[in-house]
Design a protein with these regions (language model features):
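Bacterial N-terminal signal peptides that target proteins for export
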Residues: 1-9
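Flexible loop/hinge segments at secondary-structure junctions
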Residues: 23-24, 31-378
């Protein structure tokens, strides 16, 4: 049980979302939810009880669009027991989430890839804590009428599609009539899904490494001049949905929401595996000793493992200048990374494994006030 060291002067509230908040959304607009400190039901690991007589705390976050469906639903769920904390989350993309927390423009940033040492050095508010908040996957979704629903793709085929060397769907599957042009859709903004696919292609396709000239994955898509670039997961999803012949990489939650057909990918064990919550969970189960410097689970081991899986990370300042805000933020994120994981499966995410939840909790115990005193004791 998390115990705060300071008097609770406020609770966490979120603007009521109504029924719309209960469903995932591919919108790129800000999500506003009113939440409050978790009480005994459902109960947050940091303790505390809701007190609607105290002032409201407003929290702001920005970053990965991949996390938006889960965060929207988790914040809404949290609000039902904690009605006095407002959470405004803008799905602006991982790179913006990092730059916003660096500039101290938000209470928390969100990124599919943890901040690097050079990123951390640019933070204007002091040391930053990074904690895992959800476990998702990247689907390879395609829109080809009449295409087999169990299409299998390996890394070399994907590499040649995104290098513009394979341009007709008949080259992928002989059962598909020739003459259907492949439209390769990628992220125009720096993104976690782009990083994950780049890492998978580096691991599985020498052709990709030769063409891109790197053995280090990048959040910026390395072959931006091939195919069509779109902003955020919502942009890629919309383009794939509206364009016959299109293929794109999309957070699995968005693919599920749009009822896309997704390819099975060749994993390290030699099996073709489709994205499902079970195959994503299998990837997360191999995340031993997870940390912000040891986070990569792309192309992991295990026959049932989906190779494009990832954790999403919340980024917060260790020193919280406003105690009430820091307590509210810590309680919110501790609840989302534990009890709030009950919202994962219906939206296409896998719940965080117990050992990863423990990593998140231990990270939040490091929160301090401006003098260096701990905000929570356990």
């Amino acid at each position: 049980m998390f115990k705060h060291r300071f008097p609770i002067l406020v609770t966490i509230g979120v603007v009521a979302l109504g029924a719309a908040a209960c469903s995932s959304s591919s919108s790129s607009s800000t999500t506003t939810v009113t939440t409050a400190q978790p009480g005994s039901s459902p109960g947050g690991a940091l303790g505390g009880s809701a007190d609607t007589s105290t002032p409201t705390v407003s929290l702001t976050g920005a970053g990965a669009s991949s996390a938006q469906p889960f965060l929207t639903r988790a914040f809404y769920d949290y609000n039902r027991s904690n009605p006095n904390v407002t959470v405004n989350y803008s799905p602006t993309g991982s790179s913006v989430g990092i730059s916003d927390i660096q500039a101290n423009n938000v209470n928390f940033g969100q990124s599919e890839i943890p901040m690097s040492s050079s990123d951390l050095a640019k933070a204007t508010g002091g040391p930053i804590l990074q904690l895992p908040i959800d476990l998702g996957g990247v689907a390879i979704s395609y829109n080809v009428p009449g295409t087999p629903k169990n299409l299998h793709l390996n890394g070399n085929q994907l590499a040649q599609i995104y290098l513009g060397k394979i341009t007709d769907w008949h080259q992928i599957d002989s059962s598909i009539p020739s003459g259907i042009h492949i439209v390769a859709v990628h992220r125009a903004d720096s993104s976690g899904p782009g990083y994950d696919l780049d890492q998978y292609l580096i691991d599985t396709s020498p052709t990709w490494v030769t063409a891109t000239g790197t053995t280090t994955a990048s959040k910026t898509w390395p072959e931006a001049n091939v195919g069509i670039g779109q902003q955020l997961n919502s942009g890629v999803a919309t383009y794939v949905k509206q364009t016959p012949g299109a293929i794109g990489f999309i957070e699995y939650s968005y693919a599920l929401q749009n009822k896309f057909t997704n390819a099975s990918l060749l994993n390290k064990a030699g099996a073709y595996v489709a994205p499902t919550t079970a195959s994503i969970a299998a990837a997360g189960s191999h995340a031993a000793n997870l940390s912000a410097s040891n986070y990569n689970i792309v192309n992991g081991t295990g026959r049932g493992t989906y190779p494009l899986a990832n954790f999403s990370w919340s980024l917060i300042y260790q020193k919280q200048k406003v105690i009430n805000t820091g307590i509210a933020l810590g309680k919110l994120l501790d609840w989302v990374s534990s009890t709030g994981q009950r919202n994962a499966l219906p939206l296409g995410y896998a719940p965080l494994p117990a050992n990863v939840q423990a990593v998140a909790h231990a990270t939040l115990l490091k929160l301090e006030d401006s003098t260096g005193s701990a905000l929570f004791s356990s």
